[in-house]
């Protein structure tokens, strides 16, 4: 498995070569790959590698190995629901093919990973079309973190909406919040959009209110790592603040995410686990410590935006209000 090392962008484009599920889990944990749909896809390929490693085991040993690999992968990033969703699909497939041996097991899991990958790309295009009509004909769209091709199987969720709008002839430019402390907006969103020829400017996270106050921003579009049944949205830390600002300034606040990001088993955002990451990711910048030794650092990686602040959610099923989410019936999930 070859994986673009996102931590080194935009300075260098380098691919990791991963040969087992443990390597994939480490790449997810350390954010060499990130973005809820992308880590779900990566986990699916990781499960295919686990199936390959256990291809000659007896049925019970094979299933045990697959469950262990799945548990390891699912534990790496607890907030993103796509990760567990992809692992459960892979374990369900492993239960079904446990009676087979050899390469057939590995081939079936590899094909499932490719299927999950294809589904995500198709979903991104569908939600892009659903959201494009809601963006203004011209002006500036604000986005946060990176919800583009790098965070998905391709095309993107929030950036997919922007791409689709521009492909439809709308004259839009993008303001990308830098997104401290990992700088996904500055490093990844700006890199993607520049490569696509889409006008983009980077601002610090604290500048968003100023540009809203000046009337420069016509819409906010972000991705999501998990959406609860009531429509609460967990996304990169700082999203909630942008939603509050958008409401104050009368700016529509949109969320774009595949249906796999909607967790109907979680009643509200209060039940979504919020990942706490290392203090050094915040306290060390460019190899230099910027926080005095001994001073505590808090580093929640995500926050929760209440449903009432979300104008609409764009999925492959079309535009949904947060109230409509709770009334939706999810596709049947594989057992396992």
Curated annotation (Swiss-Prot):
EC id: 5.3.1.23
InterPro entries associated with the record: IF-2B-related, IF-M1Pi, IF_2B-like_C, Initiation_fac_2B_a/b/d, M1Pi_N, NagB/RpiA_transferase-like
Pathway: Amino-acid biosynthesis; L-methionine biosynthesis via salvage pathway; L-methionine from S-methyl-5-thio-alpha-D-ribose 1-phosphate: step 1/6
UniProt xrefs under PANTHER family: METHYLTHIORIBOSE-1-PHOSPHATE ISOMERASE
Gene3D superfamilies: translation initiation factor eif-2b, domain 1, Translation initiation factor eif-2b, domain 2
Catalytic center residues: 225 (proton donor)
NCBIfam families named in the record: eIF-2B_rel, PRK05720.1, salvage_mtnA
Residues carrying the site annotation Transition state stabilizer: 145
List of residues binding substrate: 34-36, 77, 184, 235-236
Protein's name in the database: Methylthioribose-1-phosphate isomerase
Substrates-to-products reaction catalysed: 5-(methylsulfanyl)-alpha-D-ribose 1-phosphate = 5-(methylsulfanyl)-D-ribulose 1-phosphate
Biological process terms in GO annotation: L-methionine salvage from methylthioadenosine
Pfam families: IF-2B
Single annotated GO MF: S-methyl-5-thioribose-1-phosphate isomerase activity
Family the UniProt entry places it in: Belongs to the eIF-2B alpha/beta/delta subunits family. MtnA subfamily.
Summary of the function given for this chain in its UniProt record: Catalyzes the interconversion of methylthioribose-1-phosphate (MTR-1-P) into methylthioribulose-1-phosphate (MTRu-1-P).
């Amino acid at each position: 498995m070859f994986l673009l090392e996102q931590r080194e962008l935009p300075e260098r484009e380098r691919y990791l070569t991963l040969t087992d599920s443990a390597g994939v889990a480490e790449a997810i944990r350390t954010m060499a790959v990130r973005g809820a749909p992308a880590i779900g896809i990566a986990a699916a390929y990781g499960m295919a590698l686990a199936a390959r490693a256990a291809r000659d085991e007896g049925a019970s040993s094979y299933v045990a190995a697959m469950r262990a690999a799945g548990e390891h992968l699912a534990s790496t990033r607890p907030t993103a629901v796509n990760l567990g969703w992809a692992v459960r699909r892979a374990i369900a497939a492993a239960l079904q093919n446990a009676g087979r041996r050899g390469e057939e097991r590995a081939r079936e899991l590899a094909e499932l990973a490719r299927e999950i990958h294809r589904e995500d790309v198709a979903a991104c295009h569908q939600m892009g079309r659903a959201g494009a009509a809601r963006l203004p004909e011209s002006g500036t769209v604000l986005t946060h973190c990176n919800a583009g091709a790098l965070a998905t199987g391709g095309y993107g969720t929030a950036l997919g909406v922007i791409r689709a709008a521009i492909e439809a002839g709308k004259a839009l430019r993008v303001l990308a919040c830098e997104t401290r402390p990992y700088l996904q907006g500055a490093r990844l969103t700006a890199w993607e959009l520049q490569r696509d020829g889409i006008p983009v400017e980077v601002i610090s996270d604290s500048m968003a209110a100023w540009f809203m106050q000046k009337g420069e921003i016509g819409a906010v579009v972000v991705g999501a790592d998990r959406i609860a049944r009531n429509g609460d949205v967990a996304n990169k830390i700082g999203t909630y603040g942008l939603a509050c600002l958008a409401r104050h300034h009368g700016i529509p606040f949109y969320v774009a995410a595949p249906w796999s990001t909607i967790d109907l088993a979680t009643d509200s955002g209060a039940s979504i686990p919020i990942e706490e990451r290392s203090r050094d990711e915040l306290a060390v910048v460019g190899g230099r410590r910027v926080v005095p030794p001994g001073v505590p650092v808090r580093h929640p990686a995500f926050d929760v935006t209440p449903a009432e602040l979300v104008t609409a959610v764009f999925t492959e099923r079309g535009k949904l209000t947060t109230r409509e989410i709770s009334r939706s019936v999810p596709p049947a999930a594989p057992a396992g």
